[in-house]
């Protein structure tokens, strides 16, 4: 089945299955499996008479449409590159730095220009083998019982956070979880009286050598845990699925949360979350001396003395189960008219687990393009606006649910990849009221006080010395006119907190 065809089929499947029971959902999934149907039916037959495992198999197969990964052939295509990359890493002692990074980017650019890298997608529903799925189900049930911290979690949490073999779309299916379990079985999470958080820290400390790449080599394909271990460096999103594979292989209910765009900074971010005793506990994916800080610094209220101010418009959680809603559930909406964030069925909104939210009603004063039925709230970053929530247009207004406070939003329409203003931008205050930001012809002086967002980053400390000996001069007609300032020593960097 072609890629476009299977996406259409998955959309129709989700619409049908959301109204039926699990048996109907499974049957609809099997109808999409093509020549792979016998493999999936073999799993169901294998667990006949074992109620819980059969129900787990139903969950995995019923939600399998929409799950996909890289064709493992990409590893073969890139094997020579990975060897060259490792040699370069040895040269620099596997340390991330500017010279190393430039050579990594150059190495990948040269390799990808000279070699074919087949980054094709495999859909789980047409590729998953019975033997592999049975092994994953049996492993999940075994580690669930063995783990003293999670053995009493609900079956629903087990299915969503321990059971799934796929922790995020795009990864190739392999034996990573079985390998992780073989490495650590019996060492962690099996003795009563131990603190589960400290045990997780101890386990992740064993993988402290896996560090952030500093955004070098971002286009290099890393589609499985073994490749990330070989490369030693990656992005937050990659370390998150790695941790999710690792922890779930030992029975820890774990997921991946993300902010699609910051409300007061550039970029986005991804991190891990553990779900124990009905509560979620977020933590930094890479090794950090204060890794469990996110519920504290992502509360949309405080300014952290060390990390500065974070404002989050939304937090979503990747799921294995399918959740179709909004424009994606509307058969009258062309998929091309839906922002990429809302084309995925594998996520849920968990904003309220992190901060107080507010429902926002917006009067849409901008004319909507023909056929547009939904509006979006967007935040600004990297010189552009990024949609973070949707709402259906009704009588010229839209109600956006559970929005983060203390940041600026722009209501927009989305049509064929383009954004159009739907109303004036506004600031959502801490008390949930809206302050419209209307432009006019008046001008006035503005004094700007710059407060660094993350004052203690190691790189910032490193660069402070570079200012020594620098001077600032005023220019007149392109010629130096007057020296305004000279630094005779290194700068100091002091955290400033707004009260």
Please give the residue ranges for each predicted region:
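Hydrophobic/aromatic-rich core segments of domains that either
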Residues: 30, 46, 189-199, 206, ...
């Amino acid at each position: 089945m072609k890629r476009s065809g299977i996406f259409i089929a998955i959309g129709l499947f989700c619409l049908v299955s959301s109204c039926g029971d699990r048996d109907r959902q499974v049957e609809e999934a099997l109808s999409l499996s093509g020549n792979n149907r016998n493999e999936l039916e073999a799993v169901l037959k294998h667990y006949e008479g074992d109620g819980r495992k059969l129900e787990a198999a139903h969950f995995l197969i019923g939600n399998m449409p929409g799950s996909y990964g890289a064709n493992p052939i990409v590893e073969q295509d890139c094997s020579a590159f990975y060897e060259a990359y490792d040699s370069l890493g040895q040269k620099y002692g596997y340390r991330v730095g500017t010279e190393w990074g430039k050579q990594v980017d150059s190495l990948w650019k040269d390799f990808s220009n000279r070699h074919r890298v087949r980054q094709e997608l495999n859909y789980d529903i047409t590729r998953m083998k019975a033997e592999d799925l049975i092994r994953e189900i049996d492993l999940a049930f075994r580690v669930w019982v063995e783990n003293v911290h999670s053995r009493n979690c609900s079956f629903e949490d087990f299915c969503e956070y321990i059971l799934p073999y796929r922790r995020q779309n795009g990864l190739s299916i392999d034996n990573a979880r079985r390998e992780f379990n073989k490495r650590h079985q019996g060492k962690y999470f099996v003795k009563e009286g131990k603190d589960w958080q400290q045990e997780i820290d101890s386990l992740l400390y064993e993988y402290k050598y896996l560090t952030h790449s500093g955004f070098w080599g971002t286009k290099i394909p890393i589609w499985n845990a073994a490749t990330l271990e070989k490369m030693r460096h990656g992005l937050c999103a990659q370390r998150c699925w790695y941790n999710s594979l690792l922890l779930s292989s030992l029975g820890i209910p774990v997921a991946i949360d993300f902010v699609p765009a910051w409300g007061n900074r550039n970029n986005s971010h991804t991190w891990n979350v553990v779900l124990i005793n009905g509560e979620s506990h977020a933590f930094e994916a890479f090794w950090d001396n204060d890794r469990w800080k996110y519920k504290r610094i992502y509360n949309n209220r405080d300014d952290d003395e060390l990390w500065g101010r974070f404002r989050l418009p939304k937090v979503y959680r990747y799921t294995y189960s399918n959740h179709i809603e909004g424009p994606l559930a509307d058969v009258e909406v062309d998929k091309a008219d839906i922002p990429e964030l809302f084309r995925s069925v594998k996520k849920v909104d968990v904003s309220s687990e992190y901060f107080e939210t507010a429902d926002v009603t917006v009067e849409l004063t901008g004319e909507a393009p023909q056929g547009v039925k939904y509006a979006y709230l967007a935040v600004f970053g990297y010189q552009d606006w990024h949609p973070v929530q949707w709402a259906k247009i009704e009588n010229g207004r839209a109600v956006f649910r559970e929005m983060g406070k203390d940041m600026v939003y722009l209501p927009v329409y989305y049509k064929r990849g383009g954004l159009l203003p739907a109303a004036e931008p506004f600031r959502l205050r801490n008390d949930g009221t809206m302050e419209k930001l209307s432009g006019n012809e008046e001008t006035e002086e503005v004094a700007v006080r710059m407060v660094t967002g993350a004052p203690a980053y190691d790189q910032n400390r490193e660069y402070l010395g570079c200012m020594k000996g620098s001077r600032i001069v005023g220019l007149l007609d392109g010629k130096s006119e007057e020296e305004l300032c000279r630094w005779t020593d290194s700068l100091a960097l002091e955290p400033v907190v707004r009260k």
